[in-house]
Amino acid sequence: MNNQNRGMSLIELMIVVAIIGIIGAVAYPSYMATVIKTRKTDGIAMINKVMQAQERYFVNNLSYTTNLKDDLGFAANSLPSEEGAYLISAEACGGGIAECVNITAVAQGSQDTGTPADDDLELNSQGTKAGKWPNDH
């Protein structure tokens, strides 16, 4: 009598599914954290682009501006970043718009984890950063 086992038993299959589930449960949060950190470069790039335009405007007008559309030539006063992960805007710092401008990048969509201190980014014309920038510890 030739009695060969072919295939897998239900228990073996359940063990494989459980192992895959455990690996997925460990890997997915780490993957999402990496994606969120990587998308911050999208917001940072747009903040830098707006800040460069602000500095050019300051050289000519001796003041910064919150009007990104009319004064700096952007499409709107609240700009989406290139990949849409952030919404960029400008506002006067505490000392007034003539002295300082603050560029804010507010996380959008899946980039918004519900913790603005971690998600949103800010940079003012004096070089002060707020939020959790990459490489900040």
Identify what each model region corresponds to.
Residues 10-13, 54, 105:
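Conserved hydrophobic beta-strand within the GNAT/NAT acetyltransferase core sheet
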Residues 27, 34, 54:
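Conserved alpha-helical elements of the SDR catalytic core
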Residues 17, 44, 51:
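Conserved catalytic core of two-component sensor histidine kinases
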Residues 5, 34-41, 45, 96, ...:
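Residues at secondary-structure transition points
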Residues 37, 41, 49-70:
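Alpha-helix exit/C-cap motif
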Residues 29, 45-48:
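Surface-exposed alpha-helical interface segments used for non-catalytic interactions
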Residues 1-31:
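N-terminal single-pass transmembrane signal-anchor helix
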Residues 59-137:
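Periplasmic/extracellular, small/polar-rich flexible segments of pilin-like filament-forming proteins
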